[in-house]
A protein has these predicted regions:
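Short amphipathic alpha-helical segments
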Residues: 2-6, 107, 191, 195-198
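Intrinsically disordered, glycine/charged-rich C-terminal tails and inter-domain linkers
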Residues: 74, 116-201
């Protein structure tokens, strides 16, 4: 567990997250305080961090297997973006720098709902990260303190920057171009056709 928590904490800190607390074998992490890069970038950094953690765990499992630890360690991650209260809370004798609020409770609910070894995010977070993160619709939930259902999404992967735009379209008099990267099987053939067209001009 110490090996696992050490690796996950390292990823969290490098990603700009604040490690709030360890709860058994779980970690609570938040973004946006004491420093924020803006709500969108904070959300993207958090989801990217979770995906890095998921990949790192695969490497740890292989290492543990070599050591003879056959039982896999499964994880679930829940992420929600909301306004929360951050500060020092506790008693006169002991204070903890932590975050509280309904948003924290919803993130915990998402974690408990997530499939094994998956990342589940709220609609709030999805709307902030959908340009950079591939997600699949998962389910709707009724959260405590909310009068409406909340859509949830499962993280599928991080979109490559160079392939973020899948379609290229252009049209002028005597010229039409439409490229759909999702349907291309042989990129070299397409490049050859484009070069051919340029030569004929």
């Amino acid at each position: 567990i110490t090996h696992y928590l050490t690796k996950m904490t390292e990823i969290a800190i490098k990603s700009g997250g604040t490690v709030d607390k360890y709860i058994g074998d779980a970690i609570m992490i938040f973004f946006g305080d004491p420093e924020s890069r803006g709500i969108r970038d904070d959300a993207l950094a958090c989801v990217t961090m979770a995906f890095k953690m998921k990949k790192a765990l695969n490497g740890l499992r292989k290492h543990w297997k070599k050591l003879g630890l056959a039982e896999p360690l499964d994880v679930r991650m829940g992420i929600h973006t909301d306004m929360c209260t951050v500060g020092n809370f506790g008693s006169v004798d002991r204070l903890d720098y932590t975050v509280i609020g309904n948003g924290v409770n919803l993130a915990s609910r998402l974690e408990s709902m997530a499939d094994s070894n998956e990342i589940l995010i709220s609609e709030n977070t999805f709307n902030l990260v959908k340009e950079g993160i591939d997600c699949n619709y998962f389910d709707e939930i009724i959260a405590k303190g909310k009068s409406h259902s909340i859509k949830t999404f499962q993280v599928a992967g991080i979109k490559s920057k160079q392939h973020s735009s899948k379609k290229i379209q252009a049209s002028k008099n005597g010229f039409n171009l439409m490229i759909d990267k999702n349907k291309i099987n042989d990129i070299d053939e397409i490049i050859s056709l484009l070069e051919d067209g340029i030569e004929k001009l």
